[in-house]
Amino acid sequence: MPFVVVSGLSGSGKSTALRALEDAGFFITDNLPPELWGAMYDLSKARGLTRVAVSTDARTRDFLSALDDSYIRLSRREEDLHTLYLEANSEVLLKRYNFTRREHPLGETLMVDFARERELLAPLRAIADTVIDTTDLSATDLAERVLRLFRLEHDFHLRLLSFGFKHAPPRDADLVLDVRSLPNPHYDPVLRPRTGLEREVAQYVFQNQAGEDFYANLRDFVRTSAERARDTGRHGYTVAIGCTGGQHRSVAVASRLAADLRDLNVDITDHRDMKAGTRE
């Protein structure tokens, strides 16, 4: 069972690293003192957890006294034990703290806190398998580094959802797209009672080059957005496509996207507001 200990300087990105591991399927616990690592390991085994990550830092004031013993005991029980230590230069840490207006856990002046924290955490840095300097890394870059570090693989599913704006956009979508600029079959008496799943309706929606160009740009944007989500460790990504009523244009676009983006593992195409309530 992979057991990852994440530590490092306050403001260096521990929360970002822990969230990346959580998105990749790890059970995470924040600010767990070393003397509880063994108990956490036992509980995880008992509950059948397959991946566990914990973080620890200088807020656990007496953690150094238990560090060596806790680490040695755990390493004897679990071969797949990893320790990740994050750091950054003091100037960057200061900027991050000033931006978030947070207080340092040691509670002194920031530059003094950084120096003291480096000293306190030096033993943990010494036993780390990997040290990452996050000075020049964005949160996304760090998350990608963490996932690559542990060679994490995960199933990714793209969910496509068509809807009508007059029924309100879905609240759980990661990306909401408006396709109301496409030709509207509602104004054709023959096509009005039909749906975007039917070939004649789709042909009407994409009847001119402007519509084809619009779709091509939208498709490429959805692909880029979904791939970015996948590469940063997300397990799923929901794209909602909206027209006025959710009967014609959004359905046609969602269905076409499902066919064109098959390689992204389209999990389900849900036509929320289509009269028949059809699901593909």
Swiss-Prot record:
<dbReference type="InterPro" id="IPR053930">
    <property type="entry name" value="RapZ-like_N"/>
</dbReference>
<dbReference type="Pfam" id="PF03668">
    <property type="entry name" value="RapZ-like_N"/>
</dbReference>
<keyword id="KW-0067">ATP-binding</keyword>
<dbReference type="Pfam" id="PF22740">
    <property type="entry name" value="PapZ_C"/>
</dbReference>
<feature type="binding site">
    <location>
        <begin position="8"/>
        <end position="15"/>
    </location>
    <ligand>
        <name>ATP</name>
    </ligand>
</feature>
<feature type="binding site">
    <location>
        <begin position="57"/>
        <end position="60"/>
    </location>
    <ligand>
        <name>GTP</name>
    </ligand>
</feature>
<protein>
    <recommendedName>
        <fullName>Nucleotide-binding protein Deide_09390</fullName>
    </recommendedName>
</protein>
<dbReference type="InterPro" id="IPR053931">
    <property type="entry name" value="RapZ_C"/>
</dbReference>
<dbReference type="InterPro" id="IPR005337">
    <property type="entry name" value="RapZ-like"/>
</dbReference>
<comment type="function">
    <text>Displays ATPase and GTPase activities.</text>
</comment>
<dbReference type="GO" id="GO:0005525">
    <property type="term" value="F:GTP binding"/>
</dbReference>
<keyword id="KW-0547">Nucleotide-binding</keyword>
<keyword id="KW-0342">GTP-binding</keyword>
<dbReference type="GO" id="GO:0005524">
    <property type="term" value="F:ATP binding"/>
</dbReference>
<comment type="similarity">
    <text>Belongs to the RapZ-like family.</text>
</comment>
<dbReference type="InterPro" id="IPR027417">
    <property type="entry name" value="P-loop_NTPase"/>
</dbReference>
